[in-house]
């Protein structure tokens, strides 16, 4: 169940180092239980409906876009963009908002990052809510990008593999990474769209038109695909 749509009561542009500035927002009850929403991807960014997981009367809802994605800048940057940088960013956000401890809510890649943060800063975590758990293990990556999910979504897989020559298909992640970091913007964008559309087509058992449109949008796809492939 999702709660009714709501708007943030505060937004922040938090500079976390010489390169990156993060988009951070607060919604719900300023005096409520603090909860941090950790989005997926990596590179997925936050959306307005993510606020709706939480009762706005009870929770002080904090959303942020991780390095390089969403409304954070610079767009699609891979510079100093690692798990440990993101964990440090979460702490910087907590301190900036003067929160002593908060609940942490994450799904997919967000569950990986939430767990890592909780293990690193246990005294700052009131509790964890994890959904769609993904732990960035090689077996999970291989199943999704090499062989496994292709059997469930064969039509979408055809488009994903068509972007890569046959002699490079032994390592799709590596092949896509070379294209996503190419000096040629046309090569980068074509690879980004193919990578992103594959995820959009497979993120739900029954894909939706809204998801397909979002994952195919150029700016979203470039950040999402570059950052996700960089981590994988």
PLM segments and residue spans:
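Conserved hydrolase catalytic core segment
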Residues: 100-139
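Conserved HGGG/HGGXW glycine-rich cap/lid loop of the alpha/beta-hydrolase fold
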Residues: 16-74
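An accessory alpha-helical subdomain
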Residues: 165, 171-203, 212-213
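A catalytic-pocket lid/entrance helix-loop region that shapes and gates access to the active site
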Residues: 123-176, 231
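Short glycine-enriched, charge-decorated loop/helix-capping segments at active-site entrances
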Residues: 75-81, 145-146
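N-terminal cap/lid segment of alpha/beta-hydrolase-fold proteins
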Residues: 1-26, 228
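Alpha/beta-hydrolase fold catalytic core
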Residues: 193-232
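Conserved acidic catalytic loop of the alpha/beta-hydrolase fold
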Residues: 84-102
